[in-house]
Amino acid sequence: MDLKMDNVIGGKFKLGRKIGGGSFGELFLAVSLQTGEEAAVKLEPAKTKHPQLHYESKIYMLLQGGSGIPSLKWFGVQGDYNAMVIDLLGPSLEDLFNYCNRRLTLKAVLMLADQLISRVEYMHSRGFLHRDIKPDNFLMGLGRKANQVYIIDFGLAKKYRDLQTHRHIPYRENKNLTGTARYASVNTHLGVEQSRRDDLESLGYVLMYFLRGSLPWQGLKAGTKKQKYDRISEKKVSTPIEVLCKSYPPEFVSYFQYCRSLRFEDKPDYSYLKRLFRDLFIREGYQFDYVFDWTALKHPQSSARSHSSTHERHRTGKPGMGAGPSAEKPERISVGNIRDKFSGAVEAFARRNVRGPSPHQNHTRHRTLDEIPSMKPAVNMVSEKGRNTSRYGSASRRAVASGSRPSSSGEQRESRDSSRVASSGGGVRPSVFQRTQAAAAVSGYESKTASAFNRDRVAASRTARDEALRSFELLSIRK
């Protein structure tokens, strides 16, 4: 791109050095002329054959105010380019997974799972599917938000219901695979239109990827891309959930059974899924102390404190001194340390937010004109390795100790689908004190990360979303 370093985007952001690029645009560092804060600027040629930045900015605008949603600072046309300015974020979960030698501990995965499910739940509550759930599209924040997970890349997002009437999109078949084949749901491979259940099934594959280090359908060879997708589909369909989750806690089997039991239009019980993992977290004696695997690698003293408290809890049956959100927090991973490992947190963000599809994915990013919102003026707008031990045995050998979940929602459902699988009860229940402590820790974690949005900003965001909602409703639901 022929932009100069002294260019000012939207009259507010001074363009800095290029920090990434790909098939769908280029990413630059920028500095706010008003506050001096760094931001990320994504650019694409205004005359590109398949523009997507305007559509993506609309999604960002509609999601503003949600926890773990990057702030959209500005979008518009700058010279010969479409420009979108958003928060500068840290490394992706894929980057951190690689940093941790491609295996995460059960504790880290459970801490992540709670936030990841919440991010997907929020998108769904706003009427959109993500359709490309993968580790690359979840980034950690920077500075005070270094322990918060952000969801990004809405280029493949799709409206699954009318934003006002909540009418669900119709069931369809013979659809092309949209998203990343490695994490795509079975129904997506079979050509079924995606709905909320598919985002959650994809998230389940992400969690098992972190625990196992890889998935059974990785590394398959084929002559063509279509043949490779077919091989991945065959392997995924033929791999029983119990085999995929073997040697890991049965809660993961229950997670997949629930996701696959959902019918096309069913509203998922997100609270049930989070409760599955929260109860497991409590029974394992973990504390919600923000000590992820990458934190422990950078700051061994944090890991030692966490291990000591966990050991004390197992020994006495009482919470360790560090339990709960009010306990002293471990030293957090710094921006500088992140940059040391990943050649810059900025680059880590850049690589995943703008580069084109990798060999194992099939991005159906091209949109027809009727899928793009009508053009408006510029809008201002997570060192114990994965528990692959015999103590869990086969995941199907013991029942899951989880609370009963409500029956399926009262929403309209597609009649053709699989029968519902019931979760079994049993197992050792934690004490009331343990459950109260862990519930408070998890609740405190989420509430702290949301404190950055002050009342005025929420009000302004609400106004922007309402205006965007009205413009979106001028569109027909995407095919």
UniProtKB/Swiss-Prot annotation:
<dbReference type="GO" id="GO:0009506">
    <property type="term" value="C:plasmodesma"/>
</dbReference>
<feature type="active site" description="Proton acceptor">
    <location>
        <position position="132"/>
    </location>
</feature>
<comment type="subunit">
    <text>Monomer. Binds tubulins.</text>
</comment>
<feature type="compositionally biased region" description="Low complexity">
    <location>
        <begin position="390"/>
        <end position="410"/>
    </location>
</feature>
<protein>
    <recommendedName>
        <fullName>Casein kinase 1-like protein 6</fullName>
        <ecNumber>2.7.11.1</ecNumber>
    </recommendedName>
</protein>
<dbReference type="GO" id="GO:0005524">
    <property type="term" value="F:ATP binding"/>
</dbReference>
<dbReference type="GO" id="GO:0016020">
    <property type="term" value="C:membrane"/>
</dbReference>
<keyword id="KW-0723">Serine/threonine-protein kinase</keyword>
<keyword id="KW-0067">ATP-binding</keyword>
<feature type="binding site">
    <location>
        <begin position="19"/>
        <end position="27"/>
    </location>
    <ligand>
        <name>ATP</name>
    </ligand>
</feature>
<dbReference type="GO" id="GO:0004674">
    <property type="term" value="F:protein serine/threonine kinase activity"/>
</dbReference>
<comment type="function">
    <text>Casein kinases are operationally defined by their preferential utilization of acidic proteins such as caseins as substrates. It can phosphorylate a large number of proteins. Phosphorylates tubulins and microtubules in vitro. Involved in anisotropic cell growth and cell shape formation via the regulation of microtubule organization.</text>
</comment>
<dbReference type="GO" id="GO:0055028">
    <property type="term" value="C:cortical microtubule"/>
</dbReference>
<dbReference type="GO" id="GO:0001558">
    <property type="term" value="P:regulation of cell growth"/>
</dbReference>
<dbReference type="Pfam" id="PF00069">
    <property type="entry name" value="Pkinase"/>
</dbReference>
<keyword id="KW-0965">Cell junction</keyword>
<dbReference type="InterPro" id="IPR000719">
    <property type="entry name" value="Prot_kinase_dom"/>
</dbReference>
<dbReference type="InterPro" id="IPR011009">
    <property type="entry name" value="Kinase-like_dom_sf"/>
</dbReference>
<keyword id="KW-0472">Membrane</keyword>
<dbReference type="InterPro" id="IPR008271">
    <property type="entry name" value="Ser/Thr_kinase_AS"/>
</dbReference>
<comment type="similarity">
    <text>Belongs to the protein kinase superfamily. CK1 Ser/Thr protein kinase family. Casein kinase I subfamily.</text>
</comment>
<dbReference type="InterPro" id="IPR050235">
    <property type="entry name" value="CK1_Ser-Thr_kinase"/>
</dbReference>
<dbReference type="InterPro" id="IPR017441">
    <property type="entry name" value="Protein_kinase_ATP_BS"/>
</dbReference>
<dbReference type="GO" id="GO:0043622">
    <property type="term" value="P:cortical microtubule organization"/>
</dbReference>
<dbReference type="GO" id="GO:0071944">
    <property type="term" value="C:cell periphery"/>
</dbReference>
<dbReference type="GO" id="GO:0046777">
    <property type="term" value="P:protein autophosphorylation"/>
</dbReference>
<dbReference type="GO" id="GO:0106310">
    <property type="term" value="F:protein serine kinase activity"/>
</dbReference>
<feature type="binding site">
    <location>
        <position position="42"/>
    </location>
    <ligand>
        <name>ATP</name>
    </ligand>
</feature>
<feature type="region of interest" description="Disordered">
    <location>
        <begin position="350"/>
        <end position="465"/>
    </location>
</feature>
<keyword id="KW-0206">Cytoskeleton</keyword>
<feature type="compositionally biased region" description="Basic and acidic residues">
    <location>
        <begin position="328"/>
        <end position="337"/>
    </location>
</feature>
<feature type="domain" description="Protein kinase">
    <location>
        <begin position="13"/>
        <end position="282"/>
    </location>
</feature>
<keyword id="KW-0963">Cytoplasm</keyword>
<dbReference type="GO" id="GO:0030054">
    <property type="term" value="C:cell junction"/>
</dbReference>
<keyword id="KW-0547">Nucleotide-binding</keyword>
<dbReference type="GO" id="GO:0012505">
    <property type="term" value="C:endomembrane system"/>
</dbReference>
<feature type="region of interest" description="Disordered">
    <location>
        <begin position="302"/>
        <end position="337"/>
    </location>
</feature>
<dbReference type="GO" id="GO:0015631">
    <property type="term" value="F:tubulin binding"/>
</dbReference>
<dbReference type="GO" id="GO:0005856">
    <property type="term" value="C:cytoskeleton"/>
</dbReference>
<keyword id="KW-0808">Transferase</keyword>
<keyword id="KW-0493">Microtubule</keyword>
<dbReference type="GO" id="GO:0051510">
    <property type="term" value="P:regulation of unidimensional cell growth"/>
</dbReference>
